[in-house]
Amino acid sequence: MPSSKKVAPAPLATKSKASTSTKNPLFESTPKNFGIGQSIQPKRNLSRFVKWPEYVRLQRQKKILSLRLKVPPSIAQFSQTLDKNTAAQAFKLLNKYRPETSAEKKERLTKEAAAIAEGKTAKDVSPKPVVVKYGLNHVVSLIENKKAKLVLIANDVDPIELVVFLPALCKKMGVPYAIVKGKARLGTLVHKKTSAVAALTEVNSADEAELSKLVSTINANYIEKYEENRKHWGGGIMGSKANDKIAKKAKAAAAAVSTA
């Protein structure tokens, strides 16, 4: 019988050793099952499942609705607030003319009473102060009489109907106006919790140049663009899921047209 020939091994060949891992029999593998009623779920962000207080839900729904629904131009203009730098300049100027606090008022009245007792007039002790005017009815009358030199309107007044007519009134009367963020910020200016509107009627001679420069900047953003802003509706911004659905439909329609 012919002898069986063995093929010589390849040179420099390395013999592969089967890797055998020794398992400890004391440790049993327990794969996790994250189905309902099975293993404890891993920690993840569950904030979207939280039942928030009603006021939080309402403000979230209001925000979403203002993005989704079509918003008329008269209301949509309140989303175009004054830029940060110009707003800082405006508040810096108005802070110089803050109304007096209750302690300052008490001190002034005491001085006036002492002056009157001495036979002088109250004007001799305390001349007429130059302060920021606030209060919706008061500011509206100042605008109608063209006494206001600058009007700041809050963008988050609720209900918005209280101030929705003010930009049109300011435009008609030629009074410079600006829409700023935060009724609370305007409220701080006049020592109140909130304020819908604040106005300057006069300033000291040292601040005339600063006021005129500020007014020219504000007019460029509001009064000069008033007619343009009247034509632009707001809202109509859909969420990511709705946009994905629309894109998917458009893609399917395009594919159907190309195959036809």
Curated annotation (Swiss-Prot):
Protein name in UniProt: Large ribosomal subunit protein eL8A
Pfam families: Ribosomal_L7Ae
InterPro entries: eL8/uL1-like, Ribosomal_eL30-like_sf, Ribosomal_eL8-like_CS, Ribosomal_eL8/eL30/eS12/Gad45, Ribosomal_eL8/Nhp2, Ribosomal_eL8_euk
A GO BP annotation: maturation of LSU-rRNA
Known function: Component of the ribosome, a large ribonucleoprotein complex responsible for the synthesis of proteins in the cell. The small ribosomal subunit (SSU) binds messenger RNAs (mRNAs) and translates the encoded message by selecting cognate aminoacyl-transfer RNA (tRNA) molecules. The large subunit (LSU) contains the ribosomal catalytic site termed the peptidyl transferase center (PTC), which catalyzes the formation of peptide bonds, thereby polymerizing the amino acids delivered by tRNAs into a polypeptide chain.
GO molecular function: RNA binding
Residue ranges, annotated region (Disordered): 1-34
Subunit structure comment from the entry: Component of the large ribosomal subunit. Mature ribosomes consist of a small (40S) and a large (60S) subunit. The 40S subunit contains about 32 different proteins and 1 molecule of RNA (18S). The 60S subunit contains 45 different proteins and 3 molecules of RNA (25S, 5.8S and 5S).
Family: Belongs to the eukaryotic ribosomal protein eL8 family.
Organism: Candida albicans (strain SC5314 / ATCC MYA-2876)
Annotated Gene Ontology cellular component terms: cytosolic large ribosomal subunit
UniProt entry keywords in alphabetical sequence: Cytoplasm, Ribonucleoprotein, Ribosomal protein
Protein localization: Cytoplasm
SUPFAM superfamilies: L30e-like (SSF55315)
Origin: domain of life: Eukaryota
Signal peptide start and end residues: none
Gene responsible for this protein: RPL82
